[in-house]
Curated annotation (Swiss-Prot):
Region (G1): 19-26
Assembly behavior: Monomer.
Protein name: Elongation factor Tu
Every tr-type G domain range: 10-204
Length: 399
């Protein structure tokens, strides 16, 4: 029991390993657990445990993801590793595994490859705030100058995607030798984790952000007024506070006259709570599913945005045929479907494409028929007749 209590005293951070196939992401993940297990800060996970990750479904998309957990002296980590490249793309776009930071694994024997670049771009697009580089397989390169060249190449690559390439720590490691118990390489894993502790910022707790709750349901209580229910996404709301109702119709203000959870009255509701909020002077018809209740002035509704989208394959339940610019699906945003149009799209690197095939990964411009509270970094699904055909993340608000 003592262990449980100990764990909660440390801040919790979500991280993951990213990088090119066969550069050693999974081996490095196993090495971290092996080295930390010797200090009692992790359970040993071997390569096969992590590589045989079960399939998970997120927004109707099948993703293979392995989750391991471990501690350092100052933090508790949840660490995600994906076996396949397609799994990373899906994972990062759907936000199935939200990352507060990532360890970019690059083999010193190869240097940066196609997926190294793609994962850095994805990390930038979906808002992974910080990276640390693990230069892996350094035991296989005798020439120190060669290692320095690879490091320079990685730093330039990071800078080209607007990460601070000159400042990001690059640690020389060998996942395999660390697992085999060679002391000098075990020490390098400690050095890597110290870099992660120091360079991946602690996430702002949801409860410290401005209040937001997406409306799931609305009903009237005779003699008391209108109640909106939903799960508080972030922040805190107190009885007597003013809020704004944003999206679909014109923004309007109201005052919260009651907060109720499990039929009990509360003084306040906080991030993660499923609550009913009693709103003063609001009729049932003024408010509907898909609107959000927010701290006044903290969010404005928008109709045009850019997004990074993964389009499901036919085997994943997606479309069987391609679509073209002007395609009009529904965008499922927070709690509701909003009709919109995909007005333009390019491939990942901004190259022109005529049409979008099932299984593609694109950048797109979307326009909604009514303004909704969308924000940069927010996830959405693209649906057609109630079934998901794509998943995306908002990369930029246009208007």
């Amino acid at each position: 029991m003592a262990r449980e209590k100990f764990e909660r005293n440390k801040p919790h951070v979500n991280i993951g390993t990213i990088g090119h196939v066969d550069h050693g992401k999974t081996t490095l993940t196993a090495a971290i657990t092996n080295v930390l297990a010797k200090k009692g800060q992790a359970q040993v996970q071997n390569y096969a445990d992590i590589d045989g990750a079960p399939e998970e479904r997120e927004r109707g998309i099948t993703i293979n993801t392995a989750h391991v957990e471990y501690e350092t002296d100052t933090r508790h980590y949840a660490h995600v590793d994906c076996p396949g490249h397609a799994d990373y793309v899906k994972n990062m776009i759907t936000g199935a595994a939200q990352m507060d930071g990532a360890i970019l694994v690059c083999a010193a024997t190869d240097g940066p490859m196609a997926q190294t670049k793609e994962h850095i771009l994805l990390a930038k697009q979906v808002g992974v705030p910080a990276l640390v580089v693990a230069l892996n397989k350094c035991d296989m390169v005798d020439d120190e100058e060669l290692i320095e060249l690879v490091e320079m190449e990685i730093r330039e690559l990071l800078s080209s995607y607007d990460f601070p390439g000159d400042d990001i720590p690059v640690v020389q490691v060998s996942g395999l030798k660390a697992i085999e118990g060679e002391a000098e390489w075990e020490a390098k894993i400690d050095e890597l984790m110290a870099a992660v502790d120091a360079n991946i910022p602690e996430p702002v707790r949801e409860v410290d952000k401005p209040f937001l709750m997406a409306v799931e349901d609305v009903f009237s209580i005779t003699g008391r007024g209108t109640v909106a229910t939903g799960r508080i996404e972030r922040g805190i709301v107190k009885v007597g506070e003013e809020i704004e109702i944003v999206g679909i119709k014109d923004t309007r203000k109201s005052t919260v006259t009651g907060v109720e959870m499990f039929r009990k009255l509360l003084d306040e509701g906080m991030a993660g709570d499923n609550v009913g909020l009693l709103l003063r002077g609001i009729q049932k018809e003024d408010i509907e599913r898909g609107m959000v209740l927010v701290k006044p002035g903290s969010i404005t509704p928008h109709t045009k945005f850019e997004g990074e989208v993964y389009v499901l394959k036919k085997e994943e339940g997606g479309r069987h045929t391609p679509f073209f610019a002007g395609y009009r699906p529904q965008f499922y945003i927070r709690t509701t479907d909003v009709t919109g149009q995909i007005t333009a799209f390019t491939d990942r690197d901004g190259g022109n494409v005529e049409m979008v095939m099932p299984g593609d990964n694109i950048k797109m411009t979307g326009e909604l028929i009514c303004p909704v509270a969308i924000e940069q970094g927010m996830r959405f699904a693209i649906r057609e007749g109630g079934r998901t055909i794509g998943a995306g993340v908002v990369t930029k608000i246009i208007e």
